[in-house]
């Protein structure tokens, strides 16, 4: 009898254990999948209540992101001597990613990916960077961009729930220079102004043809977007006219505005995406960091129909999706994008390499590293320093998946090889802006690719990339 009771006891324990394992597996599966792919359309909470609730939560959300940035990076304003962007803004210099206590970059580079993972030594600044409020996401703009658009158009891109997170000195210069492949003789055609719906005509009438002028008008015209629209499901204090392409891609470059990619579910697996420049799209054959769209026309249409609304056509219908006409509007917009040129690089020859008569010894040494020991040219091939392919760096070799401010840090997957021409004008770096300086970028790829570069070689490599 006692033996029977003991057997029943063990059977009960076994059943409970199996149930716990089943529930845990089910929860894990749910965390990986999400409950639904769709966003909530029928908002029943009054807008005043939404705004009050999210505004009250804003300080704590901002503090959490600020604390994370300070934990990951040295955010001091330390401009490089003699190194500027096209219109004179100083580049930030130095490695800003903080190392784990007790190690050095050389010691870290000597370890295998498995050793770095098992000893938890992967630098926090190399992990994917979360959105300032990852569960909410959405477009978020630097304050200088908000101020200028509000000044010119009276249109306010301020979000009541969130502010931009990265300091201004790590962002591209504003307004950016604007160069045209069709009129290289004119140099910067922006006249030092931010191109908007209020001034595009006076700036470009007589320089662009009528088709291009209409394309530019569409690029600076705001259309409804997920956070910026006229419904109660918005993140602006008053109904918004929306967002224009050039609100993020200012003057055809970038202002560093951030968003979440719309092609991933659930929310915690979505990647932060930093706005990429439109310069040089004429030589590119892939568009979108991971989507591999094949033409500028495809991407232009995709932005309006999908990216503006987190990849959800249901909610896009509610908020006022702008369906572009492919045969005219899309082509007009694409033609303008395809004549946006890279900035001048006076030290490069016709093949995209350094002219020895113009380059410094450090730049020439850096070029040798770029094409040799550093393995950079395996993907970034001249003259524009892209192979127009996608590559998976398999960064997950170096760390165990972890939740960071409600973002699940896992593998990045295959990412487009972005051109390096004019790279000094477009910080921060990587698709999510996790690397603040070129020095950070060199340390990242030295570790990921196992280059084992010396300190001097790293400095020379930075000097070369500044000349591109």
Residue ranges and their predicted role:
Residues 1-7:
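N-terminal secretory signal peptides that target proteins for export/translocation
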Residues 9-11, 106:
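Short linear interaction motif-like sites in intrinsically disordered regions of transcription factors
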Residues 12-22:
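Bacterial N-terminal signal peptides
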Residues 26-468:
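Periplasmic c-type cytochrome electron-transfer domains
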């Amino acid at each position: 009898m006692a033996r029977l009771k003991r057997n029943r006891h063990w059977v009960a324990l076994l059943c409970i254990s199996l149930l716990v394992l089943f529930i845990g597996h089910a929860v894990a599966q749910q965390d990986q999948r999400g409950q639904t792919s769709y966003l909530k359309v029928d908002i029943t909470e009054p807008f005043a209540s939404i705004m009050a609730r999210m505004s009250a939560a804003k300080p704590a959300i901002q503090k959490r992101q600020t604390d994370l940035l300070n934990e990951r990076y040295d955010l001091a304003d330390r401009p490089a001597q003699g190194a500027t962007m096209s219109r004179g803004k100083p580049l930030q210099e130095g490695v800003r990613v903080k190392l784990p206590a007790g190690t050095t970059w050389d010691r870290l580079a000597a370890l295998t990916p498995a050793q770095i993972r098992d000893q938890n030594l992967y630098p926090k600044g190399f992990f994917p960077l979360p959105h300032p409020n990852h569960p909410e996401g959405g477009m978020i703009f630097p304050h200088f961009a908000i101020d200028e658009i509000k000044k010119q158009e009276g249109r306010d891109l301020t979000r009541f729930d969130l502010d931009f997170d990265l300091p201004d000195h790590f962002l591209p210069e504003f307004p950016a220079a604007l160069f045209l492949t069709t009129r290289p003789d004119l140099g910067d055609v922006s006249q030092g102004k931010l191109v908007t719906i209020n001034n595009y005509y006076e700036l470009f009438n007589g320089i662009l043809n009528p088709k291009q002028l209409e394309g530019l008008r569409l690029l600076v015209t705001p259309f409804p977007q997920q956070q910026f629209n006229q419904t109660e499901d918005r993140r602006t204090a008053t109904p918004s006219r929306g967002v224009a392409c050039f609100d993020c891609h200012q003057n055809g470059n970038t202002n560093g505005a951030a968003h979440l990619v719309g092609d991933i579910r659930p929310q915690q697996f979505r990647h932060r995406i930093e706005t990429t420049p439109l310069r040089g799209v004429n030589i590119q054959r892939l568009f979108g960091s991971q989507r591999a769209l094949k033409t500028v026309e495809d991407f232009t249409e995709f932005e309006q129909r999908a990216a503006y609304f987190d990849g959800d056509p249901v909610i896009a219908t509610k908020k006022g999706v702008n369906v572009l006409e492919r045969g005219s509007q899309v082509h007009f917009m694409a033609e303008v994008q395809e004549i946006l040129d890279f900035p001048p690089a006076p030290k490069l020859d016709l093949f995209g390499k350094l002219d020895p008569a113009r380059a410094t010894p450090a730049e020439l040494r850096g070029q040798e590293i770029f094409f040799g020991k550093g393995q950079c040219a395996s993907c970034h091939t001249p003259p524009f320093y892209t192979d127009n392919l996608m590559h998976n760096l398999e960064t997950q070799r170096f760390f165990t998946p972890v939740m960071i401010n409600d973002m699940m840090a896992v593998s990045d997957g295959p990412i487009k090889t972005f051109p390096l021409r004019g790279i000094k004008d477009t910080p921060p770096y990587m698709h999510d802006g996790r690397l603040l300086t070129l020095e950070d970028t060199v340390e990242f790829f030295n570790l990921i690719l196992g280059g084992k570069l010396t300190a001097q070689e790293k400095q020379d490599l930075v000097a070369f990339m500044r000349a591109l």
